[in-house]
Amino acid sequence: MLTRKQRDLLEFIHKRMQRDGVPPSFDEMKEALDLRSKSGIHRLITALEERGFIRRLAHRARAIEIVKMPDAMTGGGFEPRVIDGDRGPAPANAMAVRAAPAREVPVMGQIAAGVPIEAISQVASHVAVPEQMLGAGGNHYALEVKGDSMIDAGINDGDIVVIEEGNTADNGDIVVALVEDHEATLKRLRRKGGMIALEAANPAYETRVFRDDQVKVQGKLVGLIRTY
């Protein structure tokens, strides 16, 4: 039996992962549940983990996987948004993931979630991505994340991010940004006037601000694949 707050938090995490492909940050959870501090979120997360509804991924800051949903909340079906690789036996109460149609997406190399690295434009391999994550239409590619600047957005070093190709993005979108035509980075984009801010999701990294003509959007985040 879950409390109302526990159910509300679980539902919020589930909806955000369905929409964005990554878990919300603790600040976003706190705001969504109208709590005064993140300590309340920590207590709710711990309670959900103890009851087997979620799992916090070891050695990955604030990375959360939904293991199951309450029966009353699964009328439309439920599948975890984090795609698991080889990791040994699953917990006894873990739900089996149903096979879903998938599409091969090219992995274009590595992208920095930290200090920008040289832009990558060659296909390194391919990865199978559920069509549900890709949606209808559009071109997609994938990149391996290097660095920890986006950990508070649930994006960790070694994750594979799935990107919808395009040169436009809304304020607050997580994008692949090409800086001065030679460095690529994964950051949250903010526009103000003729300037663009590339925000990290880790307080250890500073926000970098550029003129509009120094940054080109190469695509926006639509999902995430994690193996561990």
UniProtKB/Swiss-Prot annotation:
Active site (record annotation): S149 (for autocatalytic cleavage activity), K187 (for autocatalytic cleavage activity)
Root EC class: hydrolase
InterPro entries assigned: LexA, LexA-like, LexA/Signal_pep-like_sf, LexA_DNA-bd_dom, LexA_repressor, Peptidase_S24_LexA, Peptidase_S24_S26A/B/C, WH-like_DNA-bd_sf
EC number per UniProt: 3.4.21.88
Catalytic activity: Hydrolysis of Ala-|-Gly bond in repressor LexA
Any matching Pfam family: LexA_DNA_bind
Keywords from the named record: Autocatalytic cleavage, DNA damage, DNA repair, DNA replication, DNA-binding, Hydrolase, Repressor, SOS response, Transcription, Transcription regulation
Any one biological process term the GO annotation gives: DNA repair
The UniProt record lists the keyword Cytoplasm: no
GO molecular function term, any single one: DNA binding
Site (Cleavage): A113, G114
DNA-binding region: 26-46
Family under the similarity heading: Belongs to the peptidase S24 family.
Purpose: Represses a number of genes involved in the response to DNA damage (SOS response), including recA and lexA. In the presence of single-stranded DNA, RecA interacts with LexA causing an autocatalytic cleavage which disrupts the DNA-binding part of LexA, leading to derepression of the SOS regulon and eventually DNA repair.
Assembly, per entry: Homodimer.
Descriptive protein name: LexA repressor
